Swiss-Prot record:
It comes from Plasmodium yoelii yoelii. This is Small ribosomal subunit protein eS1. Transmembrane segments: none annotated. InterPro entries: Ribosomal_eS1, Ribosomal_eS1_euk. Component of the small ribosomal subunit. Mature ribosomes consist of a small (40S) and a large (60S) subunit. The 40S subunit contains about 33 different proteins and 1 molecule of RNA (18S). The 60S subunit contains about 49 different proteins and 3 molecules of RNA (25S, 5.8S and 5S). It is found in: Cytoplasm.
Amino acid sequence: MAVGKNKRTSKGKKGGKKKVTDVFTKKEWYDLNAPKMFMVRKFGKTLVTKTIGKKLATDGLKGRIYEVNLADLNNDEDQAHKKIKLICDHIINRDCYTDFCGLSITRDKLCSLIRKGYTLIEGCTDVKTIDNYHLRMFCIAFTKKRPNQTKTTCYAQTSQIKKIRKKMVDIMHAEASKVLLKDLVKKIIPESIGKEVEKQCKKIFPLQNVLIRKVKILKRPKLDISKLMELHSDPKEDSGKNVKSLPESKEATNILTAELKH
């Protein structure tokens, strides 16, 4: 046996201890601000890597999309079936200012609406708002039993479905093309568009559970920071009180006239 150096004993231990570094020391938190169309203005926080050299932290935040439940934004549990998408557009200090970027309903809500014996009618269309937002809106509706109906099912005919779908598209165009995006969101949240569809389609076939299923933004206009800050600014009321003008005394007027004569 050759006598020599044992290579194994001279080598250091395999997989030595590595330095444990806390990843969060390189991160920082930013507050998320929702537009004033929602009740809760600060809806959460987001994490981003700190500014290192030319790589700015704000560049990593711009364009981030956050999906928030509408029940959390409006403090209303009845709106828990809707999800709102907000996109980060502008950062000031540690505040991220967001804008509306989409809407959808939850999967469990959609599954709870679909039933046997009823017809599901869906219509979608591309619309353009006054402030040049290009949207794709999806509307769904379900047939409803007529009063005093003995038949267990209530299926609509193909001709009726086509008429209802056309009405849906026309109403969505009429409601969206004449308003700003913020006003359209205010219409979608309380389902005023769905109620209008239900009202106008009543003569064709009675409907129920008519709602905007999804809103997708296809194209956004160029970012205008002044308009974005208007969405986040609260209108300030003038706190000053009206002061009544006091009538001048006769003595004061006599002194003034005497000075003018001299």
